[in-house]
Amino acid sequence: NLFGNNSYVYYYQSAFRPPDGWHLHGGAYEVVNVSTEFSNAGTTGCTAGAIYWSKNFSAASVAMTAPQNGMSWSTQEFCTAHCNFTDFVVFVTHCYKSGHGFCPLTGLIPQNYIRISAMKNSSLFYNLTVAVTKYPRFKSLQCVNNMTSVYLNGDLVFTSNETKDVSAAGVHFKAGGPITYKVMREVKALAYFVNGTAQDVILCDGSPTGLLACQYNTGNFSDGFYPFTNSSLVKEKFIVYRESSVNTTLELTNFTFSNVSNATPNTGGVQTIQLYQTITAQSGYYNLNFSFLSSFIYKASDYMYGSYHPRCKFRLETINNGLWFNSLSVSLGYGPIQGGCKQSVFENRATCCYAYSYNGPSLCKGVYRGELTKSFECGLLVFVTKTDGSRIQIRNEPLTLTQHNYNNITLDRCVEYNIYGRVGQGFITNVTNYAINYNYLADGGMAILDTSGAIDIFVVQGEYGLNYYKVNPCEDVNQQFVVSGGKLVGILTSRNETGSQPLENQFYIKIINGTRRSRR
């Protein structure tokens, strides 16, 4: 029934004619999401012979239904409905107009006829023209992934040998709505056939009725108890940490510069200044030790004399104060304090240059044309080549990162867990009120193990003391359905759940209208 928002549809091939009785078969589609739309056309009407409106989906099936009396094939009501299977689009439309701009996809369609077409890469590869006497009004269009089937008013009007999910669908209309969009998932179904026709259908959807019928492959049960298993779909995961916080100290690479004895003076120009102790930093954290500079005198920039570092807003003595770089290279050189730094920067030997005096001899040659043979005081030149960024940090101490761990424990449902490094699946319950002080707890006094080595009970430090939790199997091996009067009326389980009633050493959960009460 496409007109029920909480219902399903069931399709089976016409050649599928099993003997009378219950048969497990695919082809059922269950509604999982419903939305409505009242109009998406302009004031003058909708545009026929074109696809103008679409909604994105990723679904096994999408059904688009009009009100039960349907919509007329008119630009004042319905124009086009389509199913998009990613590689191609199937649509139904009408268009009794001629002239430029009309019927862009189909061309003129005769009056009192509709067109069902399929289009791939803007080219039509399937066309079916049908008289409106067969479909007097538009009532529904359903897109189904199985064989990319399309149903108009419940009739199969298109199919292919491909199976693809529905990626988009839509109805372009002016009035007569609303259009209801029903997104569906594919489920197996147990169908009861008589003379080759399905008379009753039970969905294998995880409901109590579906679990019972599909496990026993029948919908007819005599009174009694029926054990069953239900494989839980685990959707959640949590971690219980040993420590509330973990400190991680990152590696700090240390490099110490030292004075170079017997360094050779340059012989004229900056290109003859020899480089020493070059360090090129990679990604990470570094400490550069320039303590030997304490015996040198820093020379500030004075026109051509001294240091030159306008692109470096720091001194070498403060470079370890958390400065960030994208690339960094540092070298020592010995050259003339007069012009050595400034000309080195101008000739791209470095980004910045720092000059230091040690009252050295005047054995270094000049760096400017006309001064290449003149002698000047030699000094220590520190060359820095850098680009700004965040790959490299220069700092005094190793960086310590603190990760704070929070134990958010998911209770009363089947979850994947990592408890103090032990992983598995389980149904976690809080047993603090019933716990006793155990003498032996594994994993540093935090967990009790069962005979298989899996966690049975674990303890977590809470705000007001210790909290104890028990790990149960996700599936209750003792659970049984209760059938009375030919109907499913309850479940016997070993778990105490919300709304359950104690029954000797088990609990009874009453089932109303095929559904059960939720767990705590």
Curated annotation (Swiss-Prot):
Disulfide bonds: none
Carbohydrate-modified residues: 5, 33, 56, 84, 121, 127, 146, 161, 195, 220, 230, 247, 254, 259, 289, 408, 430, 496, 513
Record topology, Extracellular segments: 1-520
Keyword entries, A-Z: Cleavage on pair of basic residues, Fusion of virus membrane with host endosomal membrane, Fusion of virus membrane with host membrane, Glycoprotein, Host membrane, Host-virus interaction, Membrane, Viral attachment to host cell, Viral envelope protein, Viral penetration into host cytoplasm, Virion, Virulence, Virus endocytosis by host, Virus entry into host cell
Pfam families, sorted: CoV_S1_C (PF19209)
InterPro entries the UniProt entry points to: CoV_S1_C (IPR043607)
GO cellular component: host cell endoplasmic reticulum-Golgi intermediate compartment membrane; membrane; viral envelope; virion membrane
Record note on modification: Specific enzymatic cleavages in vivo yield mature proteins. The precursor is processed into S1 and S2 by host cell furin or furin-like protease to yield the mature S1 and S2 proteins. The cleavage site between S1 and S2 requires the optimal sequence [KR]-X-[KR]-R. Cleavage is not necessary for virus-cell fusion.
Gene Ontology biological process: endocytosis involved in viral entry into host cell; fusion of virus membrane with host endosome membrane; virion attachment to host cell
Assembly and oligomerization: Homotrimer; each monomer consists of a S1 and a S2 subunit. The resulting peplomers protrude from the virus surface as spikes.
Main function: S1 attaches the virion to the cell membrane by interacting with cell receptors, initiating the infection.
Protein family membership: Belongs to the coronaviruses spike protein family.
Protein name, as recorded: Spike glycoprotein
